């Protein structure tokens, strides 16, 4: 099961996900215009965790931005960073469980995590 937690508005998020034919892969979407504070506040992540009734330790966030890493870390959710244009700083390196160079590395990472006995109920 997967969710989207974004600072982007609902209209723009759904437009982009539909255009990319990805919207059907997500069980829940929480957007920046639906929470009181956007990233780096943890509100979007806490909303997803609460709504989907998932333990933070059983969730895993994939993030491409520094503010997103900060938000997930502040929410107490393990985070994997996939740096976009800017490489991870020392702070983000400490706040993440792993840094990968591409989302293509995400599936093998999830397989490795499950093989090692860590069960993530949800990817955000």
Annotate each PLM feature.
Residues 10, 14-124:
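Asp-based, Mg2+/Mn2+-dependent phosphohydrolase catalytic module
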């Amino acid at each position: 099961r997967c969710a989207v937690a974004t600072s982007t508005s609902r209209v723009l998020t759904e437009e982009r996900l539909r255009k990319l034919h990805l919207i059907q892969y997500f069980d829940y979407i929480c957007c920046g215009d639906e929470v009181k504070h956007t990233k780096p506040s943890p509100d979007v992540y806490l909303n997803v965790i609460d709504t989907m009734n998932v333990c933070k330790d059983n969730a895993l966030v994939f993030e491409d931005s520094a503010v997103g890493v900060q938000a997930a870390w502040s929410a107490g959710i393990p985070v994997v960073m996939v740096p976009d244009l800017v490489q991870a700083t020392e702070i983000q390196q400490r706040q993440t469980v792993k840094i990968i160079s591409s989302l293509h590395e995400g599936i093998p990472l999830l397989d490795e995590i499950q093989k090692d006995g860590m069960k993530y109920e949800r990817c955000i």
